[in-house]
Amino acid sequence: ELLMARSPHVKAIREYAAAMGIEKPRFTRGNDKCILCGLCVHVCSEYVGAHAITFSGRGAEKFVCAPLYRSATDCIACGACVAVCPAQCITMEDVTDAKTYVPGGAEEVGSARLVHNWNVRFPWKQCKSCGKPFPPPSPIELMEQGKPLPKDFFAICDNCRK
């Protein structure tokens, strides 16, 4: 019932509440999509090893964020948090025209992976073989392969690797 009050628009929560006979919660909390399951925090720290996100606050004020409320500088933009989130509230996109503003008024434009929730802009690498920019591979795909990776795995795009 408390999850339903916190995240009434999350489909998985509505279905679970209906199965439990809860149509409308007695409490009102807000409209936060995050259900605080902790899967994103767990996969980031235990499986990926980046420790880029954590819980902050206590009780009703608890939420997931980057440490010290800043950009998640340890984030490798792998997408593991996006993949495990049952509420689908973590957003990530690959863009070719990402802009970063630096002190002094300069602007850097290029291809990058953006993780909106953690305020991360992860620049794509240039392929050593063909020179084209490519996004970082997903650690989930790497774990599924279950075999040692070649030394230049992260320096060559998928097309040149085939």
Regions found by a protein language model. Give the residues of each.
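Ferredoxin-type iron-sulfur electron-transfer modules and their immediate structural context
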Residues: E1-C75, V82-V84, Q88-I140, F153-K162
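Short proline/glycine-enriched turn/loop segments at secondary-structure junctions
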Residues: G146-K147
